[in-house]
């Protein structure tokens, strides 16, 4: 297949955050799954219903008992749980590793080759046995004084400690925040003042997620708790406000989105919309009105024109 290119020029770029710039979907879904269990709803239903929408709108829907004066605190607490779930894996694996005897010959579960990290329980048990063998073989190269410990008891005891650490770590799910493909190059190619972030996340979550992957929130970052917003996505308000704060007409901007509600918000704002298939398959977002659909930002380049405007070039295989 030969590559095909399409280009257009705009004044500025407006980015959604989660699913577009960063991937924290696993932590978000875990947090909403907990809410679902708390209120006795099906987690899959709640997760699907909340995706791409503001936490405040979702909490109003699923926790109608919350009073208006309680809502800001409820949103802040909920979004902190997202960040806690995102940080949980790295914190606990670090703790497990530090609890195991440290020596040049000691391997921890995290330090084993990635190819050995299988997800099934059967494979996990196989890995543990193989790991025990490796560890025993490594210990065999060292002389353990009889006056200090009995060799076999020591090896068995250490092996059990490592097996326990393996079991604990293996049960964890890595929900850490990740930057998505092509994002760093895209952001670096756009001058300050020519792009903004408009997210359904409140400030705690939005700034926390971006900082975890090394993205400096732009001067114009519209979050769900912005009091100037009358409505969140799928209403166009977040993108319209972001464009206005940059000083541009939203119709002369490009919106980057990943979720159906966000794509519809971008279309309603009048902007050119690029949808990325980073959280939904192409068939799930193809009928939302996006002008272009790409796998991720690696398919798109941005060049600054002499007058400061942005030329986006989309490359696809045809």
Where are these regions (language model features)?
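Residue-level detector of anion-binding/catalytic polar loops
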Residues: 42, 194, 272
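Non-catalytic, surface-exposed connector residues within folded enzymatic/regulatory domains
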Residues: 49, 72, 200, 232-233
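Short "lid" loop at the C-terminus of a central beta-strand within the Rossmann-like core
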Residues: 52, 202-203
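Glycine- and other small-residue-rich loops at beta-strand/loop junctions that grip anionic moieties
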Residues: 172-176, 198, 231
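Generic beta-sheet signal
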Residues: 11-13, 195, 253
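N-terminal helical cap/lid subdomain that shapes the substrate entry/recognition surface
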Residues: 6-184, 191
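Conserved phosphate-coupling serine/threonine residues in phosphotransfer and NTP-handling enzymes
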Residues: 20, 199-201
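Asp-based, Mg2+/Mn2+-dependent phosphohydrolase catalytic module
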Residues: 1-9, 101, 106-119, 123-125, ...
């Amino acid at each position: 297949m030969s590559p095909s290119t399409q280009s257009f020029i705009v004044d500025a770029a407006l980015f959604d955050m989660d699913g577009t710039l960063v991937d924290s979907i696993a932590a978000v879904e875990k947090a909403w799954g907990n809410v679902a269990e708390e209120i006795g709803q099906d987690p899959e239903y709640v997760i699907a219903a909340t995706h791409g929408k503001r936490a405040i709108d979702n909490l109003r829907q699923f926790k109608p008992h919350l009073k208006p004066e309680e809502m800001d605190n409820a949103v802040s607490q909920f979004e902190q749980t997202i960040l806690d779930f995102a940080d949980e894996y790295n914190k606990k694996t670090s703790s497990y590793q530090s609890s195991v005897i440290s020596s040049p010959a000691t391997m921890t579960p995290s330090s084993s080759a990635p190819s050995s990290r299988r997800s099934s329980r059967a494979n996990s048990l196989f890995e543990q046995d193989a790991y025990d063998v490796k560890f025993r073989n490594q210990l065999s190269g060292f002389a353990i004084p009889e006056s200090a410990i009995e060799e076999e008891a020591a090896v068995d005891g250490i092996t059990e400690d490592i097996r326990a650490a393996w079991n604990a770590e293996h049960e964890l799910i890595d929900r850490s925040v990740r930057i998505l493909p092509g994002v760093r190059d895209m952001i670096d190619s756009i001058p300050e003042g020519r792009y903004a972030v408009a997210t359904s996340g409140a400030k705690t979550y939005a700034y926390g997620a971006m900082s975890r992957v090394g993205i400096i929130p732009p001067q114009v970052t519209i979050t769900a708790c912005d009091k100037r917003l009358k409505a969140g996505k799928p209403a166009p308000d977040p993108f319209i406000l972001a464009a206005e704060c940059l000083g541009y007409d939203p119709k002369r901007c490009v919106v980057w989105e990943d979720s159906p509600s966000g794509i519809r918000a971008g279309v309603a704002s009048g902007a050119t919309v690029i949808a990325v298939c980073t959280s939904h398959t192409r068939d799930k977002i193809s009928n939302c009105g996006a002008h272009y659909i790409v796998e991720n930002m690696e398919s798109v380049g941005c060049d600054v024109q002499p007058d400061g405007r942005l030329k986006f070039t989309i490359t696809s295989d045809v």
